[in-house]
Protein backbone atom coordinates (compact mmCIF):
# COMPACT_ATOMS: atom_id res chain seq x y z
CA UNK A 1 0.00 0.00 0.00
CA UNK A 2 1.23 3.51 -0.83
CA UNK A 3 2.25 5.59 2.15
CA UNK A 4 0.81 9.10 1.79
CA UNK A 5 2.96 12.03 2.91
CA UNK A 6 1.35 14.72 5.05
CA UNK A 7 -0.23 17.60 3.14
CA UNK A 8 0.79 21.23 3.67
CA UNK A 9 -1.20 24.46 3.65
CA UNK A 10 1.51 26.12 1.59
CA UNK A 11 1.94 25.65 -2.16
CA UNK A 12 3.57 22.25 -2.53
CA UNK A 13 6.42 22.44 -5.03
CA UNK A 14 7.94 19.08 -5.91
CA UNK A 15 11.17 18.92 -7.92
CA UNK A 16 11.82 15.60 -9.66
CA UNK A 17 15.56 15.29 -10.09
CA UNK A 18 18.21 16.23 -7.52
CA UNK A 19 21.10 16.90 -9.88
CA UNK A 20 22.59 20.33 -10.42
CA UNK A 21 19.48 21.98 -11.86
CA UNK A 22 17.03 20.53 -9.35
CA UNK A 23 19.24 21.06 -6.30
CA UNK A 24 20.11 24.64 -7.17
CA UNK A 25 16.46 25.40 -7.90
CA UNK A 26 15.43 24.06 -4.48
CA UNK A 27 18.26 25.93 -2.76
CA UNK A 28 17.53 29.23 -4.51
CA UNK A 29 13.77 28.90 -3.98
CA UNK A 30 14.43 28.45 -0.27
CA UNK A 31 16.41 31.70 -0.23
CA UNK A 32 13.82 33.69 -2.21
CA UNK A 33 12.04 36.16 0.11
CA UNK A 34 8.27 36.44 0.42
CA UNK A 35 7.55 33.01 -1.02
CA UNK A 36 5.05 30.58 0.45
CA UNK A 37 6.17 27.18 -0.73
CA UNK A 38 6.85 23.81 0.76
CA UNK A 39 9.68 22.27 -1.25
CA UNK A 40 10.31 18.57 -1.86
CA UNK A 41 13.39 17.46 -3.81
CA UNK A 42 13.42 13.88 -5.10
CA UNK A 43 16.58 12.26 -6.46
CA UNK A 44 17.40 8.93 -8.04
CA UNK A 45 21.03 8.95 -6.87
CA UNK A 46 22.07 8.52 -3.25
CA UNK A 47 24.22 11.66 -3.52
CA UNK A 48 22.23 14.88 -3.79
CA UNK A 49 23.31 18.37 -4.79
CA UNK A 50 26.83 17.69 -6.02
CA UNK A 51 28.57 19.60 -8.78
CA UNK A 52 28.48 17.31 -11.81
CA UNK A 53 30.82 19.65 -13.66
CA UNK A 54 33.59 18.68 -11.26
CA UNK A 55 33.37 14.92 -11.92
CA UNK A 56 36.25 15.11 -14.40
CA UNK A 57 38.38 16.97 -11.84
CA UNK A 58 37.51 14.35 -9.23
CA UNK A 59 38.45 11.57 -11.65
CA UNK A 60 41.76 13.32 -12.41
CA UNK A 61 42.43 13.52 -8.65
CA UNK A 62 42.62 17.32 -8.90
CA UNK A 63 39.99 17.77 -6.17
CA UNK A 64 38.68 15.76 -3.21
CA UNK A 65 35.21 14.48 -2.40
CA UNK A 66 34.80 17.38 0.03
CA UNK A 67 34.94 19.85 -2.87
CA UNK A 68 32.07 18.25 -4.80
CA UNK A 69 28.93 19.76 -3.18
CA UNK A 70 27.09 22.40 -5.21
CA UNK A 71 24.67 23.27 -2.41
CA UNK A 72 24.62 22.70 1.35
CA UNK A 73 21.96 20.01 1.74
CA UNK A 74 22.17 20.11 5.55
CA UNK A 75 21.22 23.79 5.55
CA UNK A 76 18.48 23.09 3.02
CA UNK A 77 16.99 20.44 5.31
CA UNK A 78 17.17 22.80 8.30
CA UNK A 79 15.45 25.43 6.14
CA UNK A 80 12.57 23.06 5.49
CA UNK A 81 13.37 21.38 2.19
CA UNK A 82 12.28 17.75 2.24
CA UNK A 83 15.01 15.81 0.42
CA UNK A 84 14.36 12.26 -0.77
CA UNK A 85 17.44 10.52 -2.19
CA UNK A 86 17.96 7.13 -3.79
CA UNK A 87 14.23 6.78 -4.42
CA UNK A 88 13.26 7.61 -8.02
CA UNK A 89 9.79 8.54 -9.18
CA UNK A 90 8.39 5.62 -11.19
CA UNK A 91 4.94 6.94 -12.08
CA UNK A 92 2.57 9.87 -11.81
CA UNK A 93 -1.13 10.71 -11.99
CA UNK A 94 -1.88 14.09 -13.53
CA UNK A 95 -5.47 14.18 -12.23
CA UNK A 96 -4.65 13.55 -8.58
CA UNK A 97 -1.23 15.27 -8.84
CA UNK A 98 0.38 12.29 -7.20
CA UNK A 99 3.85 10.82 -7.75
CA UNK A 100 4.69 7.17 -7.05
CA UNK A 101 8.19 6.43 -5.79
CA UNK A 102 10.13 3.18 -6.08
CA UNK A 103 9.97 2.72 -2.29
CA UNK A 104 6.17 2.65 -2.36
CA UNK A 105 5.53 6.07 -0.87
CA UNK A 106 3.61 8.74 -2.75
CA UNK A 107 4.13 12.48 -2.94
CA UNK A 108 1.43 15.00 -3.86
CA UNK A 109 2.22 18.31 -5.53
CA UNK A 110 0.56 21.59 -6.44
CA UNK A 111 3.33 22.54 -8.84
CA UNK A 112 5.80 20.07 -10.33
CA UNK A 113 9.19 20.71 -11.89
CA UNK A 114 10.97 18.13 -14.02
CA UNK A 115 14.74 18.43 -13.53
CA UNK A 116 15.47 14.84 -14.53
CA UNK A 117 18.56 15.69 -16.56
CA UNK A 118 19.91 13.18 -19.04
CA UNK A 119 21.63 9.84 -19.37
CA UNK A 120 24.72 8.85 -21.31
CA UNK A 121 23.82 7.81 -24.83
CA UNK A 122 24.78 4.17 -25.37
CA UNK A 123 25.52 3.66 -29.05
CA UNK A 124 23.92 0.66 -30.80
CA UNK A 125 27.14 -1.33 -31.07
CA UNK A 126 27.24 -5.11 -30.67
CA UNK A 127 28.31 -5.89 -27.10
CA UNK A 128 27.45 -2.43 -25.73
CA UNK A 129 25.21 -3.93 -23.03
CA UNK A 130 28.18 -5.60 -21.33
CA UNK A 131 28.71 -4.75 -17.65
CA UNK A 132 32.10 -3.11 -18.31
CA UNK A 133 30.58 -0.64 -20.79
CA UNK A 134 29.55 2.49 -18.89
CA UNK A 135 28.73 6.16 -19.17
CA UNK A 136 30.38 9.10 -17.45
CA UNK A 137 27.57 11.05 -15.82
CA UNK A 138 27.47 10.33 -12.08
CA UNK A 139 29.60 10.21 -8.97
CA UNK A 140 29.09 6.45 -8.97
CA UNK A 141 30.63 6.30 -12.47
CA UNK A 142 33.73 8.02 -11.10
CA UNK A 143 33.85 5.53 -8.22
CA UNK A 144 33.87 2.67 -10.74
CA UNK A 145 36.72 4.24 -12.71
CA UNK A 146 38.81 5.07 -9.65
CA UNK A 147 38.43 1.47 -8.47
CA UNK A 148 40.44 0.26 -11.49
CA UNK A 149 43.75 -1.13 -10.25
CA UNK A 150 47.08 -1.11 -12.05
CA UNK A 151 47.44 -0.08 -15.68
CA UNK A 152 44.20 -0.94 -17.45
CA UNK A 153 43.31 -0.47 -21.11
CA UNK A 154 40.33 1.86 -21.49
CA UNK A 155 38.43 2.79 -24.63
CA UNK A 156 36.56 6.12 -24.58
CA UNK A 157 33.89 6.56 -27.25
CA UNK A 158 33.53 10.23 -28.13
CA UNK A 159 36.00 13.07 -28.56
CA UNK A 160 33.75 15.81 -27.23
CA UNK A 161 34.19 17.71 -23.97
CA UNK A 162 33.11 14.88 -21.68
CA UNK A 163 35.07 12.18 -23.48
CA UNK A 164 38.31 14.15 -23.44
CA UNK A 165 37.92 15.04 -19.77
CA UNK A 166 37.33 11.37 -18.93
CA UNK A 167 40.32 10.31 -21.04
CA UNK A 168 42.70 12.73 -19.33
CA UNK A 169 41.43 11.77 -15.88
CA UNK A 170 41.99 8.07 -16.59
CA UNK A 171 45.48 8.72 -18.02
CA UNK A 172 46.37 10.65 -14.88
CA UNK A 173 45.41 7.57 -12.89
CA UNK A 174 47.91 5.50 -14.84
CA UNK A 175 45.69 3.83 -17.43
CA UNK A 176 46.20 3.38 -21.16
CA UNK A 177 43.42 5.30 -22.92
CA UNK A 178 42.34 5.36 -26.56
CA UNK A 179 39.63 7.78 -27.71
CA UNK A 180 37.45 6.88 -30.70
CA UNK A 181 35.80 9.85 -32.41
CA UNK A 182 33.66 9.78 -35.55
CA UNK A 183 34.75 13.20 -36.77
CA UNK A 184 38.15 13.82 -38.32
CA UNK A 185 39.05 16.23 -35.52
CA UNK A 186 38.34 16.60 -31.81
CA UNK A 187 35.63 18.89 -30.42
CA UNK A 188 34.31 19.35 -33.94
CA UNK A 189 31.33 21.35 -32.63
CA UNK A 190 33.57 23.82 -30.81
CA UNK A 191 36.85 23.91 -32.78
CA UNK A 192 38.05 24.03 -36.35
CA UNK A 193 40.58 21.53 -37.70
CA UNK A 194 43.64 23.66 -36.96
CA UNK A 195 42.85 24.43 -33.32
CA UNK A 196 41.76 20.82 -32.81
CA UNK A 197 45.14 19.62 -34.02
CA UNK A 198 46.87 21.77 -31.40
CA UNK A 199 44.60 20.24 -28.77
CA UNK A 200 45.27 16.72 -30.01
CA UNK A 201 49.03 17.32 -29.92
CA UNK A 202 48.81 18.43 -26.28
CA UNK A 203 46.62 15.51 -25.22
CA UNK A 204 48.93 13.04 -26.97
CA UNK A 205 51.82 14.54 -24.99
CA UNK A 206 49.80 13.76 -21.87
CA UNK A 207 49.43 10.13 -22.98
CA UNK A 208 46.00 9.94 -24.63
CA UNK A 209 45.82 8.00 -27.92
CA UNK A 210 43.28 8.64 -30.66
CA UNK A 211 41.38 6.83 -33.40
CA UNK A 212 39.79 9.64 -35.39
CA UNK A 213 37.23 9.31 -38.13
CA UNK A 214 35.86 6.02 -36.84
CA UNK A 215 33.67 4.30 -34.29
CA UNK A 216 34.12 0.74 -33.05
CA UNK A 217 32.23 -1.76 -35.17
CA UNK A 218 31.74 -4.23 -32.29
CA UNK A 219 32.79 -5.17 -28.76
CA UNK A 220 33.95 -8.77 -28.33
CA UNK A 221 32.87 -10.42 -25.08
CA UNK A 222 34.32 -13.25 -23.04
CA UNK A 223 32.30 -16.16 -21.68
CA UNK A 224 31.67 -14.09 -18.55
CA UNK A 225 30.04 -11.38 -20.65
CA UNK A 226 32.76 -8.76 -20.22
CA UNK A 227 34.13 -6.86 -23.21
CA UNK A 228 37.69 -7.97 -23.90
CA UNK A 229 38.37 -6.40 -27.32
CA UNK A 230 37.21 -3.46 -29.39
CA UNK A 231 36.81 -4.30 -33.07
CA UNK A 232 38.04 -1.36 -35.15
CA UNK A 233 36.68 -0.60 -38.61
CA UNK A 234 40.06 -1.66 -39.99
CA UNK A 235 39.45 -5.12 -38.54
CA UNK A 236 42.03 -4.69 -35.78
CA UNK A 237 41.10 -6.16 -32.39
CA UNK A 238 42.16 -3.83 -29.58
CA UNK A 239 42.40 -5.35 -26.06
CA UNK A 240 40.33 -3.44 -23.52
CA UNK A 241 39.33 -3.70 -19.86
CA UNK A 242 36.74 -0.90 -19.74
CA UNK A 243 34.67 1.03 -22.27
CA UNK A 244 33.42 4.55 -21.44
CA UNK A 245 30.60 5.91 -23.59
CA UNK A 246 30.83 9.69 -23.96
CA UNK A 247 29.14 10.09 -27.33
CA UNK A 248 26.39 12.44 -26.28
CA UNK A 249 23.44 12.43 -23.90
CA UNK A 250 19.77 11.48 -24.05
CA UNK A 251 17.35 13.73 -22.12
CA UNK A 252 15.51 11.78 -19.42
CA UNK A 253 11.90 12.15 -20.56
CA UNK A 254 10.34 8.76 -19.80
CA UNK A 255 8.17 9.91 -16.90
CA UNK A 256 6.86 12.98 -18.73
CA UNK A 257 6.23 11.04 -21.92
CA UNK A 258 4.29 8.29 -20.15
CA UNK A 259 2.16 10.96 -18.45
CA UNK A 260 1.19 12.44 -21.81
CA UNK A 261 3.19 15.66 -21.56
CA UNK A 262 4.49 17.00 -24.89
CA UNK A 263 7.95 15.62 -25.66
CA UNK A 264 10.09 16.11 -28.76
CA UNK A 265 13.84 15.63 -28.30
CA UNK A 266 13.18 16.60 -24.68
CA UNK A 267 10.27 17.95 -22.61
CA UNK A 268 8.89 20.90 -24.57
CA UNK A 269 8.65 24.17 -22.59
CA UNK A 270 7.70 27.76 -23.35
CA UNK A 271 9.59 30.92 -22.35
CA UNK A 272 8.24 30.56 -18.79
CA UNK A 273 9.61 27.00 -18.56
CA UNK A 274 6.04 25.68 -18.53
CA UNK A 275 5.21 22.35 -20.18
CA UNK A 276 2.04 21.44 -22.07
CA UNK A 277 0.29 20.66 -18.77
CA UNK A 278 -0.84 23.27 -16.22
CA UNK A 279 1.32 23.57 -13.10
CA UNK A 280 4.11 21.41 -14.55
CA UNK A 281 7.45 22.92 -15.55
CA UNK A 282 10.80 21.59 -16.75
CA UNK A 283 14.34 22.91 -16.87
CA UNK A 284 17.89 21.80 -17.51
CA UNK A 285 19.04 18.97 -19.74
CA UNK A 286 15.60 17.35 -19.81
CA UNK A 287 13.88 20.35 -21.42
CA UNK A 288 13.63 21.72 -24.94
CA UNK A 289 12.91 25.33 -25.87
CA UNK A 290 12.53 26.50 -29.46
CA UNK A 291 13.81 23.10 -30.67
CA UNK A 292 17.03 23.49 -28.69
CA UNK A 293 18.26 21.39 -25.76
CA UNK A 294 20.74 22.49 -23.13
CA UNK A 295 23.88 20.78 -21.87
CA UNK A 296 25.89 23.72 -20.51
CA UNK A 297 25.45 25.35 -17.12
CA UNK A 298 25.00 29.02 -18.10
CA UNK A 299 21.59 28.71 -19.82
CA UNK A 300 20.35 26.32 -17.13
CA UNK A 301 21.21 28.82 -14.39
CA UNK A 302 19.24 31.40 -16.37
CA UNK A 303 16.31 28.98 -16.58
CA UNK A 304 16.37 28.64 -12.79
CA UNK A 305 16.16 32.42 -12.34
CA UNK A 306 13.27 32.63 -14.80
CA UNK A 307 11.38 29.78 -13.16
CA UNK A 308 11.78 31.21 -9.65
CA UNK A 309 10.39 34.50 -10.95
CA UNK A 310 7.42 32.69 -12.51
CA UNK A 311 6.77 30.58 -9.39
CA UNK A 312 6.82 33.79 -7.34
CA UNK A 313 3.93 35.12 -9.43
CA UNK A 314 5.98 37.58 -11.46
CA UNK A 315 6.73 37.77 -15.17
CA UNK A 316 9.79 35.87 -16.37
CA UNK A 317 10.99 35.05 -19.86
CA UNK A 318 13.80 32.72 -20.96
CA UNK A 319 15.83 33.79 -23.99
CA UNK A 320 18.53 31.71 -25.68
CA UNK A 321 21.93 33.41 -25.61
CA UNK A 322 25.35 32.35 -26.97
CA UNK A 323 27.25 30.25 -24.44
CA UNK A 324 31.04 29.89 -24.35
CA UNK A 325 32.72 26.50 -24.11
CA UNK A 326 35.78 25.62 -22.04
CA UNK A 327 37.56 22.30 -21.53
CA UNK A 328 38.21 21.35 -17.89
CA UNK A 329 41.66 19.82 -18.35
CA UNK A 330 44.60 21.10 -16.33
CA UNK A 331 47.24 22.57 -18.64
CA UNK A 332 44.88 22.99 -21.61
CA UNK A 333 43.36 26.40 -22.31
CA UNK A 334 40.69 26.80 -24.96
CA UNK A 335 37.66 29.01 -25.45
CA UNK A 336 34.94 28.76 -28.08
CA UNK A 337 31.71 30.66 -28.57
CA UNK A 338 29.25 31.41 -31.34
CA UNK A 339 29.59 30.60 -35.01
CA UNK A 340 32.90 28.84 -35.63
CA UNK A 341 32.29 27.46 -39.14
CA UNK A 342 31.97 30.56 -41.35
CA UNK A 343 29.66 30.91 -44.32
CA UNK A 344 30.42 32.78 -47.55
CA UNK A 345 29.09 36.01 -46.07
CA UNK A 346 31.47 35.89 -43.10
CA UNK A 347 35.01 37.22 -42.75
CA UNK A 348 37.64 35.34 -40.74
CA UNK A 349 40.59 36.84 -38.90
CA UNK A 350 43.40 34.52 -37.77
CA UNK A 351 46.38 34.75 -35.44
CA UNK A 352 48.84 31.85 -35.10
CA UNK A 353 51.95 31.38 -32.98
CA UNK A 354 53.08 27.84 -33.72
CA UNK A 355 56.01 27.90 -31.31
CA UNK A 356 53.78 28.93 -28.40
CA UNK A 357 50.80 26.80 -29.54
CA UNK A 358 48.59 29.88 -29.63
CA UNK A 359 45.73 30.17 -32.09
CA UNK A 360 42.92 32.67 -32.58
CA UNK A 361 40.08 32.68 -35.07
CA UNK A 362 37.47 35.42 -35.17
CA UNK A 363 34.37 35.26 -37.36
CA UNK A 364 32.87 38.62 -38.32
CA UNK A 365 29.63 39.31 -40.18
CA UNK A 366 28.51 42.77 -41.27
CA UNK A 367 30.62 44.51 -38.66
CA UNK A 368 29.61 42.20 -35.80
CA UNK A 369 31.74 39.59 -34.10
CA UNK A 370 29.74 36.34 -34.28
CA UNK A 371 32.24 33.59 -33.41
CA UNK A 372 35.53 33.06 -31.57
CA UNK A 373 38.04 30.24 -31.12
CA UNK A 374 40.97 30.75 -28.75
CA UNK A 375 43.60 28.13 -27.99
CA UNK A 376 46.56 28.69 -25.68
CA UNK A 377 46.05 32.30 -24.62
CA UNK A 378 42.38 32.68 -23.69
CA UNK A 379 42.68 35.86 -21.61
CA UNK A 380 40.50 37.86 -24.00
CA UNK A 381 37.70 35.29 -24.10
CA UNK A 382 35.33 37.16 -21.79
CA UNK A 383 35.91 40.42 -23.69
CA UNK A 384 35.16 38.82 -27.06
CA UNK A 385 32.07 37.22 -25.52
CA UNK A 386 30.92 40.63 -24.31
CA UNK A 387 31.32 42.03 -27.83
CA UNK A 388 29.12 39.22 -29.17
CA UNK A 389 26.49 39.59 -26.46
CA UNK A 390 26.26 43.36 -26.82
CA UNK A 391 26.33 43.24 -30.64
CA UNK A 392 29.11 45.81 -30.63
CA UNK A 393 30.11 47.05 -34.08
CA UNK A 394 33.79 46.15 -34.52
CA UNK A 395 34.26 47.59 -38.01
CA UNK A 396 36.66 50.31 -36.87
CA UNK A 397 38.98 47.89 -35.06
CA UNK A 398 39.20 44.94 -37.44
CA UNK A 399 42.95 45.38 -37.98
CA UNK A 400 43.72 44.99 -34.28
CA UNK A 401 40.74 42.94 -33.07
CA UNK A 402 42.56 39.61 -33.13
CA UNK A 403 45.22 40.96 -30.73
CA UNK A 404 42.67 41.53 -27.99
CA UNK A 405 41.19 44.18 -25.77
CA UNK A 406 44.46 45.89 -24.85
CA UNK A 407 44.96 46.89 -28.49
CA UNK A 408 41.39 48.00 -29.15
CA UNK A 409 39.64 49.23 -26.01
CA UNK A 410 36.32 50.03 -27.72
CA UNK A 411 33.36 51.52 -25.97
CA UNK A 412 31.18 48.49 -25.30
CA UNK A 413 27.52 49.30 -26.00
How would you label these PLM feature ranges?
Residues 2-12, 18, 31, 286-382:
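Mid-to-C-terminal Rossmann-like scaffold of FAD/NAD(P)H-dependent oxidoreductases
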Residues 116-173:
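Glycine-rich dinucleotide-binding loop and its adjacent helix/turn
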Residues 2-82, 169-190:
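Beta1-alpha1 glycine-rich phosphate/pyrophosphate-binding loop at the start
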Residues 236-260, 332-413:
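C-terminal catalytic lobe of FAD-dependent flavoproteins
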Residues 20, 24, 46, 118-120, ...:
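Residue-level detector of alpha-helix initiation sites
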Residues 129-150, 226-231, 236-309:
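FAD-site-proximal beta/loop scaffold in flavoenzymes
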Residues 16, 107-119, 238-248, 304, ...:
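Short hydrophobic core segments
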Residues 38, 77, 83-100, 107, ...:
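A Rossmann-like FAD-binding core segment of flavoenzymes
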